[in-house]
């Protein structure tokens, strides 16, 4: 059995497609409390894909961010340690802020992700196997429900289909993002053979808007 948290989200749905032949236990954000109270089949779990979180970078709901992004993440990481289950966790490149030289989270979402990254670093030797991936700007199929949080690529594609043109803003050529296709993210997370650690997951090729 593979546990997939955030199974109804953009990236979670793409993991489900890739794992369609596997036995999956889906855990969505609203089910997290019930899952914590009732799930007892840890001995059947071969892998945890912890993709669930409040992902809105503009969220100011500190209570919800603390509960879902920090406390639930720490709890499921603790279960991975307790039962020695391999786990792969979705962090975020937002922990860096404007540069990659230091940690400088610019919003509460990024702070919540960095908090868990630090927790992982402190406990990394207790896991049987853990990989945390700092996703850069992921785009691809399934972004329809993300609204204003969708990638520029998704927004531009929708604009072309609806209006036949793309709306840019002044200075958009100076805004660079590392766009990475969701299928590549899924493939790398599921199939890479790197040791336990925290990794950046992007292309290393920033592109302007």
Model-derived regions, located:
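Active-site segment of SDR-like NAD(P)-dependent oxidoreductases
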Residues: 8, 54-55, 92-100, 136-139
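NAD(P)H-binding glycine-rich loop region in Rossmannoid oxidoreductase-like domains
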Residues: 38-68, 97-98
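Adenosine-cofactor binding site in Rossmann-like domains, unifying the SAM/SAH pocket
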Residues: 23-41
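Glycine-rich NAD(P)-binding loop of the Rossmann-fold in SDR/ketoreductase-type enzymes
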Residues: 64-75, 107, 111-112
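N-terminal Rossmann NAD(P)H-binding glycine-rich loop of SDR-like oxidoreductase domains
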Residues: 2-19
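Conserved Rossmann-fold NAD(P)-dependent oxidoreductase catalytic core, especially the SDR/UDP-sugar
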Residues: 74-108, 131
